[in-house]
Every structure is written in C-alpha cells, then in structure tokens.
Amino acid sequence: MKRTYQPSKLRRARKHGFRNRMSTKNGRRVLAARRRKGRKVLAA
C-alpha cells in the first residue's frame, strides 16, 4: 500500500508557505498568532 505522505517541497511551500499565508486575511491571523506565541518558524 502506498503511504499517504509523499513529500514535495513545492507543494508544501504553496500550501503552507509564508506568501500563501499573507495572501488571505485568515492566513495573516495565523502568522500573527504564531508571532504572539513566539514561534521560531512562522511558516513552511
């Protein structure tokens, strides 16, 4: 059986990357929350 996680850097960046987060209001909310929490990494 094929495993469900088949990593792809491009797909990861497009779905969860910084520029994608910045492109929507809710995405910016995610980044703000992660900054508030003090996350070292904000986006993929």
From Swiss-Prot:
Superkingdom: Bacteria
GO cellular component: ribonucleoprotein complex; ribosome
One of the GO BP terms on file: translation
Keyword Ribonucleoprotein annotated: yes
Pfam entry (one): Ribosomal_L34
HAMAP family assigned: Ribosomal_bL34
Protein name: Large ribosomal subunit protein bL34
Family named by the database record: Belongs to the bacterial ribosomal protein bL34 family.
